[in-house]
Design a protein with these regions (language model features):
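Conserved catalytic/switch belt of AAA+ P-loop NTPases
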Residues: 137-182
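Walker A/P-loop
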Residues: 62-99, 126-127, 156
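Active-site phosphate-binding and catalytic loops of NTP-dependent enzymes
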Residues: 20-24, 58-65, 93, 119-121, ...
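AAA+/P-loop NTPase substrate/partner-engagement loops
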Residues: 89-118, 124, 144
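Short loop/turn elements that form and flank the Walker-type P-loop nucleotide-binding site
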Residues: 64-67, 90, 115, 128-133, ...
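Conserved alpha-helical scaffold flanking the Walker A/P-loop in AAA+ ATPase domains
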Residues: 113-137, 168-175
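The Walker A (P-loop) glycine that initiates the GxxxxGKT/S ATP-binding motif of P-loop NTPases
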Residues: 73, 110, 139
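Extended, charged alpha-helical coiled-coil/arm scaffolds that mediate oligomerization and mechanical coupling
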Residues: 1-61
Length: 186
């Protein structure tokens, strides 16, 4: 057996496990969605209205790209649990990626050298098993820039609707469509 066999097998397993065409079906009943959000969170009226507005437009046309929602507030007000409630209300899988203290962009987009792995975006997609989850990118304000790169610039590429249909993880080295993901930032 070749010494590279394990590396090749690992790459193929990652490639085969990316949920290229597997997606969950969104709940589109606005009354049910609103009830689920109200049952789990008191207040947050504007945030709930924005989610309902997105679902209403999405139910008319599937051409609408997923919005990027930014939840702002002091610690402990329920931003993370509200993001989880959105995913449950929409019947989508939920992924949380903590960005606090991240200083290496390769953590998000993987690395290409031998023995490396995909970044958190791809591994999270594989873990959740669908191509349209709700992604919570937590503590975006705590990203750090250093000699390893600027994860904020990488994050901009991931979130930009004109680019995220053709996202390329450095390890996978194939285009992955992230446009169906509902990104929520805190």
């Amino acid at each position: 057996m070749s010494p590279d066999a394990g590396i090749i097998r690992n790459y193929i397993e990652y490639l085969l496990n990316v949920p290229w065409y597997t997606e969950t079906r969104d709940e589109r009943d606005l009354i049910k969605i609103e009830k689920k959000l109200n049952d789990t969170h008191y207040g947050m009226k504007k945030a709930k209205e924005r989610v309902i507005e997105y679902i209403a437009v999405k139910s008319i046309t599937d051409e609408v790209s997923s919005p990027i929602i930014c939840l702002v507030g002091p610690p402990g007000v329920g931003k993370t649990t509200f993001a989880e409630s959105i995913s449950k209300a929409l019947d989508r899988n939920f992924v949380k990626i903590s960005l606090g203290g991240m200083s290496d962009s390769a953590e998000l987009v993987g690395q290409a050298y031998i023995g490396s792995n995909p970044g958190k975006i791809v591994t999270s997609l594989i873990k959740c098993g669908s191509n349209n989850p709700v992604f919570l990118l937590d503590e975006v304000d705590k990203l750090k820039k250093d000699y390893k790169g600027d994860p904020a610039s990488t994050l901009l590429d991931i979130l930009d609707v004109s680019q995220n249909k053709r996202f390329v993880d450095n390890y996978i080295d194939e285009e992955i469509d992230l446009s169906k993901i509902l990104f929520i930032l805190t």
